[in-house]
Amino acid sequence: MEVNILAFIATALFILVPTAFLLIIYVKTVSQSVE
């Protein structure tokens, strides 16, 4: 179970980090378009 939990955390970070990075770029692009 411990290994599965660590794998789940690693996978979650691997997915969330790039997603958050893309969201930040998207928000910046939209804000610039509105202006």
From Swiss-Prot:
Key words of the record: Chloroplast, Membrane, Photosynthesis, Photosystem II, Plastid, Reaction center, Thylakoid, Transmembrane, Transmembrane helix
Pfam family, one: PsbM
Membrane disposition: Single-pass membrane protein
Quaternary structure and interacting proteins, as annotated: PSII is composed of 1 copy each of membrane proteins PsbA, PsbB, PsbC, PsbD, PsbE, PsbF, PsbH, PsbI, PsbJ, PsbK, PsbL, PsbM, PsbT, PsbX, PsbY, PsbZ, Psb30/Ycf12, at least 3 peripheral proteins of the oxygen-evolving complex and a large number of cofactors. It forms dimeric complexes.
HAMAP family: PSII_PsbM
Family designation: Belongs to the PsbM family.
Name recorded for this polypeptide: Photosystem II reaction center protein M
Gene: psbM
